[in-house]
């Protein structure tokens, strides 16, 4: 790894207090140095580049104007908060971003007092910040609370729930809207700047609030008329600005747009509005990838580009040899094949078309692929509506995000028996994104839902088979879970075949011990079985394929043959696949010795998947050791 050294100013910033000791005219240099440092680190330690570069200026401004950590900053998603981490005492640790034993790629309260609320998922910042603001007011504190949310996260319903509730409280809540994708129409530039200056002036706001408050106290104006005057005031502003503003419809004062990449202007505006009473929103226009030309020109590619050469802008590639495809691409190609067969086949994704390869369908059949925004619950119910009218939706959602649509899976899909295929991408441990993004809970919370099928393929062929079966061989709700990244087969384009629901298969016959696995982790288990065979241990291996319903015929046979069973899953062992096996054995009065291998009852940190497997005792060496211990002590 290249030696990375921060430069002049930021080398002496170990806390926001150090930042606030600088002169305002030094802040642009701080921003340049932060961008340079982020580029140098991320070129060799992959992370979220584009959003972090775009957020540098307003991050510096927030820590310069507000008294953090007493004042709270709540980050939505948090992948844009790299400069925040650098400024809050983690400059050196930043070199080990998203690594095992290093710092998280997202804000984490366990890591720093400046990380006020855990982040990773979208649209929750306003609700969390509002709760903090209300609590601070209840304790008669003067703390200011700031929520930082992107325009993408504003597509999530929870953000609007927070906005709606915020209007009920007079607390000093500031919402920073980081708009880097033109999601909100542009305001008039010169007039808008004038309006921001006027509306943020101390004189204007003091007179405005004191007048209404005083009039009410001396009963010269009723509450109704006071509100009417406020409406008149808002209408007058709208007339001047030639627009009607969504946020002020929530009774939240709106300022902007402001150039979110002009740190001096941001300091000026933040100082003007920070002491205003009531909830308010500051709309910032930022450029994703700001300061690095390749990232500015291709925002999607440079969101998380992997390793790259800073000077040339070329992303580093692996060796030029045949490799298995990503499970995501197999899903994308197979979905297009099914869509070629049947015009009823459609795709749905909540804002992850590139990540899940829904883009393949979008390119060929743009009118049959729907990106519904960051709205997982809506995506599920939208799919149920499509199915109700005879379409066959493949709803692709990351496993960690289906948690946000659990009620809809039960109420709107399973209860009605809708022919919806839910494909859970990034199931299992996911590596560097860490605890907020692991897809380890889905098997536990889905297997208790009636009238739903849950399956996980061993490899790419099985994924294609299950997708065909979900489309043609089963007319109810079905969940297919598969991991992030590459599969195991280079020759993966098989002709898909229908598979029987609730039917597993024996991969290796054996006598001494039985392994039961589900999903791609079975490939690692198979290698363990082969290593045991080299040592003279006859181990059997069964790929169960279906979590729900289980292959009970196969389980009866296993229970009658083996005294010792090891279940292996890439998911939480509490209530997961292994628990399902144990429940079956108990229900049928079988008493084998069972050991469950999976994710233990704790949150697993960031790092590589092999490191996470080893930490959880799910790697090949741990399985070998466990097997030998069980056989030595029957």
UniProtKB/Swiss-Prot annotation:
GO biological process: 1-deoxy-D-xylulose 5-phosphate biosynthetic process; isopentenyl diphosphate biosynthetic process, methylerythritol 4-phosphate pathway; terpenoid biosynthetic process; thiamine biosynthetic process
Residue numbers binding thiamine diphosphate: 79, 120-122, 152-153, 180, 292, 376
Cofactor note: Binds 1 Mg(2+) ion per subunit. Binds 1 thiamine pyrophosphate per subunit.
PROSITE patterns in UniProt: TRANSKETOLASE_2
Keywords: Isoprene biosynthesis, Magnesium, Metal-binding, Thiamine biosynthesis, Thiamine pyrophosphate, Transferase
GO CC annotation terms, alphabetical: cytosol
Entry-linked InterPro entries: Dxylulose-5-P_synthase, THDP-binding, Transketo_C/PFOR_II, Transketolase-like_Pyr-bd, Transketolase_BS, Transketolase_C
Entries under Pfam families matching the protein: DXP_synthase_N (PF13292), Transket_pyr (PF02779), Transketolase_C (PF02780)
Residues involved in Mg(2+) binding: 151, 180
Recorded catalytic activity of this chain's protein: D-glyceraldehyde 3-phosphate + pyruvate + H(+) = 1-deoxy-D-xylulose 5-phosphate + CO2
Pathway the protein contributes to: Metabolic intermediate biosynthesis; 1-deoxy-D-xylulose 5-phosphate biosynthesis; 1-deoxy-D-xylulose 5-phosphate from D-glyceraldehyde 3-phosphate and pyruvate: step 1/1
UniProt similarity note: Belongs to the transketolase family. DXPS subfamily.
Role noted for this protein: Catalyzes the acyloin condensation reaction between C atoms 2 and 3 of pyruvate and glyceraldehyde 3-phosphate to yield 1-deoxy-D-xylulose-5-phosphate (DXP).
Designated name of the protein: 1-deoxy-D-xylulose-5-phosphate synthase
Species in which this protein is naturally found: Porphyromonas gingivalis (strain ATCC BAA-308 / W83)
Gene: dxs
């Amino acid at each position: 790894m290249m030696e990375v050294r921060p430069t002049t100013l930021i080398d002496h910033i170990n806390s926001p207090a150090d930042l606030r000791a600088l002169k305002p005219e030094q802040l642009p240099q701080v921003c340049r140095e932060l961008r340079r440092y982020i580029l140098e680190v991320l070129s060799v330690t992959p992370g979220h580049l584009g959003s972090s570069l775009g957020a540098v200026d307003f991050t510096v401004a927030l820590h310069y104007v507000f008294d953090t950590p007493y004042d709270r900053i709540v980050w939505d998603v948090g992948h844009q908060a790299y400069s925040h981490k650098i400024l809050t005492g983690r400059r050196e640790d930043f070199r080990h971003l998203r690594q095992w034993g290093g710092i998280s790629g997202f804000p984490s309260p366990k890591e720093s007092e400046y990380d006020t609320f855990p982040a990773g998922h979208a649209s929750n910042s306003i609700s969390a910040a509002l709760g903090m603001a209300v609590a601070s007011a209840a304790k008669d504190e003067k703390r200011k609370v700031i929520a930082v949310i992107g325009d993408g996260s504003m597509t999530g319903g929870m953000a609007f729930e927070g906005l709606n509730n915020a209007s009920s409280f007079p607390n000093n809540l500031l919402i920073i809207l980081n708009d880097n994708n033109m999601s909100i129409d542009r305001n008039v530039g010169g007039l808008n700047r004038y309006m921001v200056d006027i509306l943020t002036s101390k004189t204007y706001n003091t007179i405005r609030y004191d007048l209404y408050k005083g009039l009410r106290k001396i009963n010269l104006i009723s509450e109704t008329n006071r509100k009417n005057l406020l409406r008149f005031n808002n209408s007058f502003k709208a007339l001047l600005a030639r627009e009607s503003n969504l946020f002020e419809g929530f009774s939240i004062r709106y300022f902007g747009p402001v150039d979110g990449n002009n740190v001096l202007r941001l300091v000026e505006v933040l100082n003007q509005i920070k002491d205003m009473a009531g909830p308010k929103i500051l709309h910032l226009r930022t450029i994703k990838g700001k300061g690095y030309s390749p990232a500015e020109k291709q925002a999607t590619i440079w969101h998380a580009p992997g390793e790259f050469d800073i000077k040339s802008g070329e992303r580093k590639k692996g060796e030029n040899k045949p490799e298995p495809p990503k499970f995501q691409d197999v899903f994308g190609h197979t979905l297009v094949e099914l869509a070629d067969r049947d015009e009823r086949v459609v795709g749905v994704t909540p804002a992850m078309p590139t990540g899940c390869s829904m883009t393949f369908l979008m390119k060929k059949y743009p009118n049959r692929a729907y990106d519904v925004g960051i709205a997982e619950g809506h995506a599920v119910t939208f799919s149920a509506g499509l199915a109700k009218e005879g379409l066959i939706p493949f709803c692709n959602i990351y496993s960690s995000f289906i948690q946000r649509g659990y009620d809809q899976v039960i109420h709107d899909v399973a209860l009605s028996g809708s022919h919806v295929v839910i494909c859970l991408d990034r199931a299992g441990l996911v590596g560097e994104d860490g605890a907020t993004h692991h897809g380890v809970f889905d098997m536990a919370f889905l297997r208790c839902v009636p009238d739903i099928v849950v399956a996980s393929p061993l490899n790419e062929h099985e994924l294609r088979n299950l997708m065909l079966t979900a489309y043609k061989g089963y007319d109810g709700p079905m969940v297919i879970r598969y991991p992030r990244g590459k599969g195991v087969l280079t020759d993966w384009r098989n002709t898909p075949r229908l598979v029987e629901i609730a039917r597993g298969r024996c991969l290796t016959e054996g006598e001494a011990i039985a392994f039961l696995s589900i999903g791609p982790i079975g490939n690692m288990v198979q290698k363990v079985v082969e290593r045991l065979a080299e040592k003279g241990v006859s181990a059997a291996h069964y790929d169960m394929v279906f979590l729900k319903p289980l292959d009970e015929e196969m389980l009866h046979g296993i229970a009658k043959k083996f005294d010792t069973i090891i279940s292996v899953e890439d998911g939480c062992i509490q209530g997961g696949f292994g628990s399902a096996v144990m429940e079956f054995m108990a229900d049928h009065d079988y008493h084998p010795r069972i050991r469950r291998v999976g994710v233990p009852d704790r949150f697993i940190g960031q790092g590589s998947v092999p490191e996470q497997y080893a930490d959880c005792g799910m790697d090949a060496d741990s399985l070998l050791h466990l097997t030998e211990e069980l056989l030595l002590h029957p």
